[in-house]
């Protein structure tokens, strides 16, 4: 983030605009809308700026800039085409810690003006940091179309009743749930239709209803990595959560979608580190839910595929806590799609089997004859550490050493890496694979080179000379 978006109260503050042509006029108008005291320095005033001066909405200080005019100024905008003057103004403002914007020169700006969607008191500001003004304009048009013109009236009425609601509901959670319920009710529609009296009646009626503080636990599948693969329902739940317990595999892009004031707790497990136990995770879920919180358990992929999600909602059920499950795109499905490897194919595979590498030990996973069937694609979650063992078992039970394999690291993300090789050479390949990774075994991997569409790095391009049987790459 190159710029921190903040909203500044300019009411009655002295600001200085240097230049009073068309560009300067646009900045003056914005500053006047923010109720700032606008002072102008310009050799000439355009006709519309002259009207503002006549109506005493601005103050014309001088035709020429002087350092004395920076005294007691909160913010400066320079809208001139004088490069030397702009450089001088920028330097002197920085020396005085005065906010300055040199129009159309973002390297000489301590702040920039965003594109504004005004539904006062509701304000939406967006910016591309000066990199893509046309894209910014298109986004503004889309947002303008989404937000009704009278949406500001909704905020105004809510503001007038805010203190009364605070007195009526002393508990913060009660207040938040009241407002959430109200804004999802016909209250908003009444205001947008101009029926403010009916809207107030709805508000009063909701005030007299009991607010339930019953907590709940929601399992949410975050998908395989790309934040665009999070479901719409998953996004809605993250925006409503009070507490989010998340795995370390969940990407930062998805974590950024969580409601800003929600409590976030990482409960992920990592090899070689001291980890929170599953029992401790369950205790945390129940603890927060029993306090009336909406608790989200955010898990990579899908919560019911090797995710112990069932154990967590069993505990919720036993504790009498309401729960729900929001499925996610499981890693095998998402990553295979992003690497151009169809898990089933009429020519290569009649089915697919999912297993986890953590349980590949004799006595627990003992159906190797089925797993070795070449007519099935085998997908191994968390298989890096046991990859050599798995390959040996599959070969022992009849799978060809030339069976193609793909190891995918950080699948569906911009850091996705793909290693393609043969089952018999996995011992040479696996050192180049980071953990965690997904292992796909089967003839469908033949299609990777042809069908790969998402840009990723093929690690073996760098080390291909070490292998003898990579003819299918």
Swiss-Prot record:
The modification Phosphoserine is found at residue 128. PROSITE patterns: SUMT_1 (PS00839), SUMT_2 (PS00840). NAD(+) binds at residues 22-23, 43-44. The keyword Transport does not apply. It comes from the Bacteria. InterPro entries: 4pyrrol_Mease, 4pyrrol_Methylase_sf, 4pyrrole_Mease_sub1, 4pyrrole_Mease_sub2, CobA/CysG_C, NAD(P)-bd_dom_sf, Siro_Cobalamin_biosynth, Sirohaem_synt_dimer_dom_sf. One of its GO terms (molecular function) is NAD binding. The active site is at residues 247, 269. Gene3D superfamilies: Cobalt-precorrin-4 Transmethylase, Domain 1, Methyltransferase, Cobalt-precorrin-4 Transmethylase, Domain 2, NAD(P)-binding Rossmann-like Domain, Sirohaem synthase, dimerisation domain, Siroheme synthase, domain 2. Pathway: Cofactor biosynthesis; adenosylcobalamin biosynthesis; precorrin-2 from uroporphyrinogen III: step 1/1; Cofactor biosynthesis; adenosylcobalamin biosynthesis; sirohydrochlorin from precorrin-2: step 1/1; Porphyrin-containing compound metabolism; siroheme biosynthesis; precorrin-2 from uroporphyrinogen III: step 1/1; Porphyrin-containing compound metabolism; siroheme biosynthesis; siroheme from sirohydrochlorin: step 1/1. Transmembrane segments: none annotated. Its EC number is 2.1.1.107, 1.3.1.76, 4.99.1.4. It catalyses: uroporphyrinogen III + 2 S-adenosyl-L-methionine = precorrin-2 + 2 S-adenosyl-L-homocysteine + H(+); precorrin-2 + NAD(+) = sirohydrochlorin + NADH + 2 H(+); siroheme + 2 H(+) = sirohydrochlorin + Fe(2+). One of its GO terms (biological process) is siroheme biosynthetic process. Pfam families: CysG_dimeriser, NAD_binding_7, TP_methylase. SUPFAM superfamilies: NAD(P)-binding Rossmann-fold domains (SSF51735), Siroheme synthase middle domains-like (SSF75615), Tetrapyrrole methylase (SSF53790). Then it catalyzes the NAD-dependent ring dehydrogenation of precorrin-2 to yield sirohydrochlorin. Finally, it catalyzes the ferrochelation of sirohydrochlorin to yield siroheme. In the N-terminal section; belongs to the precorrin-2 dehydrogenase / sirohydrochlorin ferrochelatase family. In the C-terminal section; belongs to the precorrin methyltransferase family. This is Siroheme synthase. It comes from Buchnera aphidicola subsp. Acyrthosiphon pisum (strain APS). The lineage of its organism: Bacteria, Pseudomonadati, Pseudomonadota, Gammaproteobacteria, Enterobacterales. The gene is cysG.
């Amino acid at each position: 983030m190159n710029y921190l978006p903040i909203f500044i109260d300019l009411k009655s503050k002295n600001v200085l605009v240097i230049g009073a042509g068309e560009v300067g006029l646009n900045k003056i108008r914005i500053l006047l809308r923010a109720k700032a005291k606008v002072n102008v320095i310009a050799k000439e005033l355009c006709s519309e700026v002259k009207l503002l001066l006549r109506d005493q909405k601005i103050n014309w200080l001088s035709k020429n800039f002087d350092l004395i005019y920076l005294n007691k100024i909160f913010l400066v905008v320079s809208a001139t085409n004088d490069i030397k003057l702009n450089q001088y103004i920028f330097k002197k403002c920085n020396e005085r810690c005065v906010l300055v914007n040199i129009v159309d020169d973002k390297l000489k700006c301590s702040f920039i003006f965003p594109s504004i969607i005004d539904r006062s008191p509701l304000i939406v500001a967006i910016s591309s940091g000066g990199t893509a003004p046309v894209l910014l304009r298109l986004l503004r048009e889309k947002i303008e179309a989404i937000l009704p013109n009278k949406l500001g009236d909704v905020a105004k009425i809510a503001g007038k009743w805010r203190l009364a609601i605070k007195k009526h509901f002393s508990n913060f959670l009660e207040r938040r749930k009241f407002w959430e319920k109200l804004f999802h009710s016909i209250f908003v529609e009444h205001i947008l239709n101009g029926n403010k009296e009916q809207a107030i009646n709805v508000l009063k009626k909701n005030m007299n209803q009991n607010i339930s503080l019953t907590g709940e636990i929601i399992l949410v599948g975050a998908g395989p990595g790309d934040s665009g693969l999070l479901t719409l329902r998953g996004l809605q739940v993250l925006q409503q959560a009070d507490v989010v317990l998340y795995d370390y595999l969940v990407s930062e892009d998805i974590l950024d979608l969580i409601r800003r004031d929600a409590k976030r707790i990482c409960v992920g497990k990592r090899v070689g580190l001291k980890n929170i136990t599953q029992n401790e995770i369950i205790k945390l879920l129940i603890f927060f839910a029993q306090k009336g919180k909406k608790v989200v358990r955010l898990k990579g992929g899908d919560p019911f595929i090797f995710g112990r999600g069932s154990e967590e909602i069993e505990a919720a059920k036993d504790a009498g806590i309401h729960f729900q499950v929001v499925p996610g795109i499981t890693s095998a499905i998402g990553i295979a799609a992003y690497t151009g490897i169809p898990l089933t194919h009429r020519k290569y595979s009649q089915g697919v089997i999912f297993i986890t590498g953590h349980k590949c030990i004799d006595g627990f996973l003992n159906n190797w004859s089925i797993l070795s069937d070449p007519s099935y694609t085998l997908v191994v979650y968390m298989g890096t550490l046991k990859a050599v063992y798995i390959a040996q078992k599959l070969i022992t039970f009849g799978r060809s050493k030339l069976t193609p394999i793909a190891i995918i690291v950080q699948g569906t993300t911009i850091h996705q890496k793909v290693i393609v090789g043969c089952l018999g050479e996995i011992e040479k390949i696996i050192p180049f694979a980071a953990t965690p990774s997904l292992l796909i075994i089967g003839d469908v991997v033949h299609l990777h080179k042809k069908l790969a569409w998402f840009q990723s790095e093929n690690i073996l391009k760098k080390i291909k000379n070490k292998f003898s049987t990579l003819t299918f790459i």
